[in-house]
Amino acid sequence: MNKIIVNGGKSLKGEVNINSAKNSVLPIIAASILSGDKCIIENAPMLEDVFVISEVLKSISSEVDIDRDNNKIIIDTSNICNSEPCSELVKKLRASFLIMGPMISRFGNFKISLPGGCNIGTRPIDLHLKGLNALGADINIGYGYVEAKADKLKGNKIYLDFPSVGATENLMMAAVLAEGDTIIQNAAEEPEIEDLAKFLNSMGANIVGAGTDTINIIGVKDLKGVVHKPIYDRIEAGTFMTAAAITRSKIKLNGVNEGHLRPIIAKLTEIGVKIDTNGDSMIVDGNHQLKPVDIKTMPYPGFPTDMQAQTMALLTSIEGTSIVTETIFENRFMHATEMKRMGSNIKIDGRSAVIEGGNELTGCEVKATDLRAGAALILCGLVARGSTNVTDVYHIDRGYANIEKKLQALGAEIYRI
């Protein structure tokens, strides 16, 4: 099954349930290493990335049981006896590098191949390594591997040159068992950072300030296993909000956190979409006169880079000129080439894309170049004339569970072959 076929022109209606956040679950799975005990993740999304990082943990002798029927993951890291995970697995998923902090903190040594993931630009690991070095780890890089050793990590003050989510998570996990106090300045503020801190604190860590630009961590001696339910996936929610907008439809989302979605809500509201939230549910009505806007991706609480491609898809359907500026990754406009094959008028100028919206799109074969690009091409297919064939859908499966089934339930004519 390597294609998703979308026959455009159908309006959407009904309800869709949003999964818990992939970008919370991946670091939480990594953090389970710190306890040496059993941790249970409830309401876990059944995604390819989740399966890969689970296999990474198995490759260092952890026990990981994935209960797909009940969306539960049970992790027992008490018998870890290998300090080098399978390199082929690590190369599949960039988030595999998140186990470095927990492994060094608990065991004092670790070796890992350079990580993989979506090809959306250079995402250097230097911030991770500089921070781990500041905590006392001796770092060596060579022949495609990173090796770290430390008798015992010691707390320190760390300033991140950029508020990297992965570096913030890795250093936070490394510091919880370090001796003394650690302060991470210019830390990432994403909701997933807060969720990881909540998980770690429930294990017995002492973390204050997660979700702000300064995180204080007082090291503790050990951590215990816990049960945790992650936050909702704000990017999946944003994708379905955009699906309602691009099809000029009205749908209900169940499983949202309005606070986490504020940047997306603000921009869609500016476009003309009507959004009403009640508790953890949201009504999104795109059946209004929509107008072009300018968007600039920024670290949270700015507009998320992970919603850039989907929003570009929406803007191609709105008459007028929009400008999208990508400030996080330098190579995240590959979907524009595929959208142009469908009839979109998009011009790339460095880190900006100029969209002359309103052209009718025509279905054709397009390639999902990365996770969010794949979702964006499906959105284009929902409104294109004729049939759109999206290939390389393994990218999409990394972050969306059964996206075609969820859209089918809303009335879209979409299927997988």
UniProtKB/Swiss-Prot annotation:
<dbReference type="GO" id="GO:0019277">
    <property type="term" value="P:UDP-N-acetylgalactosamine biosynthetic process"/>
</dbReference>
<dbReference type="InterPro" id="IPR005750">
    <property type="entry name" value="UDP_GlcNAc_COvinyl_MurA"/>
</dbReference>
<keyword id="KW-0963">Cytoplasm</keyword>
<keyword id="KW-0131">Cell cycle</keyword>
<keyword id="KW-0808">Transferase</keyword>
<keyword id="KW-0961">Cell wall biogenesis/degradation</keyword>
<dbReference type="GO" id="GO:0008760">
    <property type="term" value="F:UDP-N-acetylglucosamine 1-carboxyvinyltransferase activity"/>
</dbReference>
<dbReference type="GO" id="GO:0008360">
    <property type="term" value="P:regulation of cell shape"/>
</dbReference>
<keyword id="KW-0670">Pyruvate</keyword>
<dbReference type="GO" id="GO:0005737">
    <property type="term" value="C:cytoplasm"/>
</dbReference>
<feature type="binding site">
    <location>
        <begin position="22"/>
        <end position="23"/>
    </location>
    <ligand>
        <name>phosphoenolpyruvate</name>
    </ligand>
</feature>
<comment type="pathway">
    <text>Cell wall biogenesis; peptidoglycan biosynthesis.</text>
</comment>
<dbReference type="Pfam" id="PF00275">
    <property type="entry name" value="EPSP_synthase"/>
</dbReference>
<keyword id="KW-0573">Peptidoglycan synthesis</keyword>
<dbReference type="InterPro" id="IPR013792">
    <property type="entry name" value="RNA3'P_cycl/enolpyr_Trfase_a/b"/>
</dbReference>
<feature type="binding site">
    <location>
        <position position="306"/>
    </location>
    <ligand>
        <name>UDP-N-acetyl-alpha-D-glucosamine</name>
    </ligand>
</feature>
<dbReference type="GO" id="GO:0071555">
    <property type="term" value="P:cell wall organization"/>
</dbReference>
<keyword id="KW-0132">Cell division</keyword>
<comment type="function">
    <text>Cell wall formation. Adds enolpyruvyl to UDP-N-acetylglucosamine.</text>
</comment>
<feature type="modified residue" description="2-(S-cysteinyl)pyruvic acid O-phosphothioketal">
    <location>
        <position position="118"/>
    </location>
</feature>
<protein>
    <recommendedName>
        <fullName>UDP-N-acetylglucosamine 1-carboxyvinyltransferase 2</fullName>
        <ecNumber>2.5.1.7</ecNumber>
    </recommendedName>
</protein>
<comment type="similarity">
    <text>Belongs to the EPSP synthase family. MurA subfamily.</text>
</comment>
<dbReference type="GO" id="GO:0009252">
    <property type="term" value="P:peptidoglycan biosynthetic process"/>
</dbReference>
<dbReference type="GO" id="GO:0051301">
    <property type="term" value="P:cell division"/>
</dbReference>
<feature type="binding site">
    <location>
        <position position="94"/>
    </location>
    <ligand>
        <name>UDP-N-acetyl-alpha-D-glucosamine</name>
    </ligand>
</feature>
<dbReference type="InterPro" id="IPR001986">
    <property type="entry name" value="Enolpyruvate_Tfrase_dom"/>
</dbReference>
<feature type="active site" description="Proton donor">
    <location>
        <position position="118"/>
    </location>
</feature>
<dbReference type="InterPro" id="IPR036968">
    <property type="entry name" value="Enolpyruvate_Tfrase_sf"/>
</dbReference>
<feature type="binding site">
    <location>
        <begin position="123"/>
        <end position="127"/>
    </location>
    <ligand>
        <name>UDP-N-acetyl-alpha-D-glucosamine</name>
    </ligand>
</feature>
<feature type="binding site">
    <location>
        <position position="328"/>
    </location>
    <ligand>
        <name>UDP-N-acetyl-alpha-D-glucosamine</name>
    </ligand>
</feature>
<dbReference type="InterPro" id="IPR050068">
    <property type="entry name" value="MurA_subfamily"/>
</dbReference>
<keyword id="KW-0133">Cell shape</keyword>
